[in-house]
Structure formats: structure tokens, C-alpha cells
């Protein structure tokens, strides 16, 4: 086990608004706790991952997904000697900006906002933690550490288009405390790829539960076939539920093992000795080997063909899009009926997008019925 603690973001450079340090929690632990106690995090319980929240109690929602991502990210960061609190914090926060009805809802809201700056769920997460959560007297938002803000900004890698960040958040809001040119920290990269590991594997579990495909379909992928063969004779009465759980469990474990091994190789091959080296590299350091990149591609293709493009899912997505579209223009027609003066004092269209994106599936459905 190699220790890369010298590459960890172990100390914080502070926050946008100065605060006294806690006597018993690190700045990153405070960030995590602020996220967990936020209204936006609680609402993730009733937001779609793939299946609308009303479809069943056992399907994953945004909150269960975020917790699973955080668990994977924390384990990886801890093994590498990095800041596991920060990796966990970024993972818990990464989906705060998601709309109701998943990516379909985001697409619909972006279409509504196309002439008003657009909508992006990653940047909406920043809007939430910087402006929209109201819990403190001296500032809006959660006033998270600069390292957490930086990691959320770079969830998908280095920033390619600063104009979008400026349009949706405002570069001045960061008060020159963020370096927009750097690549993301190792903790940010770990959080991002843990997101991929979690949803690729857990969507398989949910897809089988929803009977969109079965175990025989899954083991057409050689990666899963090999795992299946290693377990099928050891499961009493060939219990399929346990067998599927063991397959997903081993899949996650194998992906994490490959990721850690390949990350160590990348650190060595790129002669990464300091945080500055991490920031200056254009390509991600935390990534799969070529073998597992191919496996990931196969898994994504499988899920897209069997699940995401399933007729039932597409119908639900289209219904969700219609709800978002209707809500946007109904609220736009009478904004004062739904939003207060403080929300409307700047950009009405952005305020409507903030309002709709913060809705749960259930709230959006019920509001649509009564509007």
C-alpha cells in the first residue's frame, strides 16, 4: 500500500467568507456536515436516478446514489493516503443540482433556458452551495471551503469554458480565490470516477429488479460472465438475488482495484511528486486501465440499449420533460405567484430555473396537476 499523503489536500486555504475554525472538526468535515444538513441534500431522496420516485421503494434515488458514490470515493482516497473527508464531501454534493426526472428533466430545463444562459446541473450544484441555501446570517449559501468549491467546479475535469461559469455563477463570486486554469485535485478526480463506478453497477441492479433485462442478458458481457462463473456453484439453491448481489459486489471491487493500480502507475509514469504536478497535468491521473475502459464502454452500451432506451423509461422521460416545460412557462407567466421579491430581484428566468431544478419529482408532479 503506497501512501500519497503529500499529494492530498490536507489543509484548507479557507472560504469565500472568513470563519473561525471549529475546535473539533476539520474544515472538510464541516463542509460534509453542512451538505448533509442542507435542504437540497434532503430533497435528493425524492429525485429520480433512473426510475421516477413513485415507481417503487427499492429503486435508487439521487440520495442513495450519492451515499454510494461517497462510500466508494472514501475507500479509494483512504487507501491512497489522500483526504478521504474531502472525497466524501465532493461525492455527497455532486448531484445537488439535479432537476426532477433525472437527465430528461435537465434537458427540458436547458431547452427552456436556451435563450437565457442555459442550464447545467453541475454548475447548478455551485449555485446551490454558493447562493441558494439560506442558513447563515452573514452570507448566502453554505460557504464551503475553496477546495470543495474547486472540486465541484471540476467534477468533469478542467474547466474548458469559463464563459459558462461566468454566465451561470459569476467569476467575481469566487473573489479571485479559485484557480480556474488548474486541473482538479486527486480527491475531485476520485469523486468523479466513483460516480461512474456507482451508477454503472447499481443501474444494473435496478434494471434487473425492474425486469428490463435478466442475468442471462448481463452475462453476455464477458466481464460479468467470468464473475458469474466464479460464484454460480457456491450459491445455495442458486439464489439469483444473492448471485446478482455478489456479481455487482465483485464488479465494483475489480473496478476499484484496477483504478487504484492504474492511478499508482500514472503517478509514477508522470513523475508526480507534488500538488503542483497534479494541477499541471492535462489528462486525469485517476482513471481506469485500457482494459477496464473497454469494459466500462461495454457496460454503458449495455445499459443504454437495455435500460435507458427502454420504452417504459423513454415514456417516463418524455412525461417528465412535458411537466418541466409546462411548469416553466406557467411560472414565467405569473412569477410572483410562485417566487418572492428577493428571488425575482435579479434574473427572473434564472430564478424560475433555480425553483424548478430544486423540486422533487413528487412536488413537480403535484404542482403540475394543480397549476
UniProtKB/Swiss-Prot annotation:
Keywords recorded for this protein, A-Z: Hydrolase
GO molecular function, one term: dGTPase activity
InterPro entries the UniProt entry points to: dGTPase, dGTPase-like, dNTPase_2, HD/PDEase_dom, HD_domain, PHydrolase_assoc_dom
Single biological process term from Gene Ontology: dGTP catabolic process
Span of domain HD: 62-200
Family: Belongs to the dGTPase family. Type 2 subfamily.
PANTHER family in the cross-refs: DEOXYGUANOSINETRIPHOSPHATE TRIPHOSPHOHYDROLASE-LIKE PROTEIN, DEOXYNUCLEOSIDE TRIPHOSPHATE TRIPHOSPHOHYDROLASE
Protein name as annotated: Deoxyguanosinetriphosphate triphosphohydrolase-like protein
Provenance organism: Pelagibacter ubique (strain HTCC1062)
Amino acid at each position: 500500500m503506497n501512501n500519497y499523503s503529500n499529494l492530498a489536500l490536507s489543509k484548507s486555504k479557507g472560504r469565500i467568507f472568513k470563519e473561525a475554525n471549529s475546535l473539533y472538526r476539520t474544515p472538510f468535515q464541516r463542509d460534509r456536515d453542512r451538505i448533509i444538513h442542507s435542504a437540497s441534500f434532503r430533497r435528493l431522496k425524492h429525485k429520480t436516478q433512473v426510475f421516477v420516485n413513485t415507481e417503487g421503494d427499492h429503486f435508487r434515488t439521487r440520495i442513495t446514489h450519492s451515499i454510494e458514490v461517497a462510500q466508494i470515493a472514501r475507500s479509494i482516497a483512504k487507501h491512497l493516503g489522500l483526504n478521504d473527508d474531502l472525497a466524501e464531501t465532493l461525492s455527497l454534493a455532486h448531484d445537488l443540482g439535479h432537476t426532477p426526472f433525472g437527465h430528461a428533466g435537465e434537458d427540458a430545463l436547458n431547452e427552456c433556458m436556451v435563450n437565457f444562459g442555459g442550464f447545467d446541473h453541475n454548475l447548478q450544484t455551485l449555485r446551490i452551495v454558493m447562493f441558494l441555501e439560506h442558513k447563515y446570517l452573514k452570507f448566502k449559501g453554505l460557504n464551503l471551503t475553496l477546495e470543495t468549491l474547486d472540486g465541484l467546479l471540476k467534477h468533469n475535469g478542467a474547466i474548458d469554458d469559463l464563459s459558462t461559469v461566468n454566465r451561470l455563477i459569476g467569476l467575481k463570486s469566487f473573489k479571485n480565490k479559485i484557480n480556474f486554469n488548474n486541473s482538479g485535485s486527486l480527491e475531485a478526480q476520485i469523486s468523479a470516477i466513483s460516480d461512474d463506478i456507482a451508477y454503472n453497477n447499481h443501474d444494473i441492479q435496478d434494471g434487473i429488479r425492474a425486469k428490463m433485462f435478466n442475468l442471462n442478458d448481463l452475462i453476455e458481457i464477458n466481464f460479468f460472465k467470468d464473475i458469474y462463473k466464479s460464484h454460480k456453484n457456491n450459491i445455495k439453491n442458486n439464489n439469483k438475488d444473492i448471485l446478482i448481489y455478489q456479481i455487482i459486489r465483485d464488479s465494483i471491487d475489480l473496478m476499484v482495484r484496477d483504478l487504484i493500480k492504474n492511478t499508482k502507475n500514472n503517478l509514477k509514469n508522470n513523475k508526480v511528486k507534488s500538488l503542483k504536478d497534479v494541477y499541471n497535468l492535462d489528462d486525469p491521473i485517476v482513471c481506469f486501465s485500457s482494459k477496464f475502459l473497454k469494459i466500462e464502454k461495454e457496460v454503458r452500451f449495455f445499459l443504454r440499449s437495455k435500460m435507458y432506451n427502454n420504452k417504459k423509461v423513454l415514456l417516463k422521460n418524455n412525461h417528465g420533460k412535458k411537466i418541466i416545460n409546462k411548469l416553466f412557462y406557467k411560472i414565467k407567466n405569473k412569477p410572483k405567484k410562485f417566487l418572492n421579491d428577493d428571488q425575482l430581484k435579479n434574473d427572473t428566468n434564472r430564478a424560475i430555473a433555480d425553483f424548478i431544478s430544486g423540486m422533487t419529482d413528487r412536488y413537480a408532479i403535484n404542482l403540475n396537476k394543480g397549476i
